[in-house]
């Protein structure tokens, strides 16, 4: 999944064991020896040095989390997903990749996404606007053009 979102990169899940940690002498292969999973990625090259999640920017961490979520969904799918501003910290190229991924995955599940970015709107097929007036929120179906117009007004100049 990571390579679909970042074609030039590579992502891996790395199983962490006690004997991988400093000062550990346990070479046991039992379940108790496994202590977690780490994420290791490269955004620039398949041969580039891998970085740990702690070294990444907020947007890169978000992209890694989304790749992991999408991979888990492939193994254990649900019929419905609600994602709130999942693209907020992503660069435009990654917002487009995530929108395309959701469009592809939506063939087998329903996705409801909130966004203030045009890339997600381009891939969607139904749009709703939320209006807050007189201390009351209301929702109405809107056109793609209205949705794009709204998010473009919200973008910093």
Where are these regions (language model features)?
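Terminal ABC-like ATPase head and other globular end-domains that cap long coiled-coil arms
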Residues: 1-157
């Amino acid at each position: 999944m990571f390579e679909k979102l970042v074609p030039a990169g590579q992502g891996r899940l790395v199983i962490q064991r006690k004997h991988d940690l400093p000062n550990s002498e346990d070479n046991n292969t039992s379940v108790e020896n496994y202590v977690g999973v780490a994420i290791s990625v490269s955004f620039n090259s398949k041969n580039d040095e891998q970085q740990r999640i702690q070294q990444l920017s907020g947007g890169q961490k978000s992209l890694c989390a989304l790749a992991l979520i999408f991979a888990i969904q492939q193994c254990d799918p649900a019929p419905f997903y609600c994602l709130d501003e999942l693209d907020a910290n992503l660069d435009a190229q990654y917002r487009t990749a995530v929108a395309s991924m959701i469009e592809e995955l939506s063939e087998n599940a329903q996705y409801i996404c909130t966004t203030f970015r045009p890339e997600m709107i381009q891939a969607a097929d139904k749009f709703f606007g939320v209006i807050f007036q007189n201390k009351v929120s209301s929702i109405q179906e809107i056109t793609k053009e209205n949705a794009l117009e709204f998010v473009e007004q919200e973008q910093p100049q």
